[in-house]
Amino acid sequence: MPATLLRIHPENPPHSRIQQAVDVLRKGGVIIYPTDTVYGIGCDVTNAKAVEKVCRIKGIHPDKANLSFICSDLSHISDYAHGITTATYKVIKKALPGPFTFLFEASPKAPRFGGVKRKTVGIRVPDNQIILQLVKELGNPIVSTSVREDENTLEEYVTDPDLIFEKYRLLVDLVIDGGFGGNTPSTIVDCTNDDFELIRQGAGDIEQYL
């Protein structure tokens, strides 16, 4: 069955439409949604079959997938990551919500994708009301990966929800149109060694928070 295209106002998302997207996730669906950077593909972190579907869409094996978790706030972080020092927490609290993915050591509670225990986990709290309200209503983080196929190629379709819908409508269950997205990914920062190591420079400047 083709996906549904759901238009949601980016500044004032109606609760009824957020709930519609949450219902899809709770049924094991895969959705595409806006963030503060590039549109993402994701599902409920607790649904293993949905995670496998996300990986199939991206052409990656679950145990090798670099999937991040989108959280609504910092309260989820301790559930999936450990070893976060007070100094590190102060920095990420200032930086989030924002265009960053922070890498931490995975806690024992972190889901196993493909039956393999994760060593690290990427945490995202995007500055986007649609996805923040969606995750809050769901009550679980969303496993997330970018709709971009090639990080080194400028792909026109990734910024336009209508073009994204045309490309993915037979692969996912729902595409949220929250307006035009960006084409620059999040900045990835490794926090596993009590330091802030820049892995990928993206839309966010971590230096201003250090």
Question: Model regions: which residues?
Answer:
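Active-site-adjacent structural elements in enzyme catalytic cores
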Residues: 1-210
